[in-house]
Amino acid sequence: YYLNYPILFDYLSQAEKPVVWTLHDCWAFTGHCSHFATANCYRWKSGCFTCPLKGIYPRSIGLDRSRENYADKRYYFNKVKNLTIVTVSQWLNQLVQQSMLRYDNLICIPNGIDLNCFRPIDHIDPKYDFAGKKVLLGVGTKWTREKGYDDFVELAKHIDDDYRIVLLGLNVNRVNRLPDKIIAVHRTENMDVLVQLYNRALVLLTLSHNDTYPTTNLESLACGTPVITYPTGGSPEAIDETTGCVVEAGNFNALIEAIRTIDRNGKAHYSAHCRARAEKLFDKDLQFAKYGELYKQITDPAHNAAVKITD
């Protein structure tokens, strides 16, 4: 967001080298925002102005330059002749096709994860027993309303006492104001802790209102834990009917019923399907190989004629 892109794209257009640009959000084709869903704003399709999200990250203080930013991006980002755009979800891929980015070379390569790290385990540390309650897990790095914090607080008012919401990544201010049925686990860089929590959970809840393709969904599935998600961005692409479900954003009756359905069926009903889906679709080595094939295509004309990348 803070790159001097006019200088960069001037250079790339003059260098005449193959370029691969991986998009993780919508910033490249809007006049300001990285996600537009919460504002229900589609001005990016024709030209941004009077941005309703200029106070949201990446925050703009003072003047609204969304009109100028949009024009600048349209000019500079379309200058590179030999550019391939990669999106991490089909949802984002479809948005790019509707945007001012005019490139035919557009493919989807999803995020990948380390399946040796994120895996089912037999032993859970007793400190994550949580008094034997059934764990509804939420994982985040910066908990905001857009990332679903308010939804978890509201959900806590409606769940039965045999459930507990466990939120990973809360800051101190949030921790001090939590309802009784929410347990905080401080942010950690220790992957073992994350794997323990995924395995301990009955289900991962992805209640974000803005997202592109949450890696947490993939990590949870790899650990054998099903996912319930809102229909946000590309989040539903990670699951199918054997590994979780999609519920309407903010519909807590539907969310609670989905939780109860998974609970009635039992986590074991889903675990093997979750792991199998992760092994088939989300192995990081699989995604690395797709990038490798892409690089061969754009640098080797003979290889380009013989091999085609598939999404």
Residue map of PLM features:
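Conserved acidic donor-binding segment of nucleotide-sugar-dependent glycosyltransferases
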Residues: 241, 245-252, 261-267
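Aromatic "clamp/platform" in nucleotide-sugar-dependent glycosyltransferases that forms part
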Residues: 209
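Nucleotide-activated donor-binding/catalytic signature segment of Leloir-type glycosyltransferases, i.e.
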Residues: 169-195
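Short alpha-helical donor nucleotide-sugar binding micro-motif in glycosyltransferases
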Residues: 196-201
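Acidic anion/phosphate-binding donor-loop and adjacent secondary structure
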Residues: 97, 113-127, 176-177
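Conserved donor-binding/catalytic core segment of Leloir-type glycosyltransferases
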Residues: 128-147, 153-157
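Carbohydrate-associated surface elements
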Residues: 91, 112
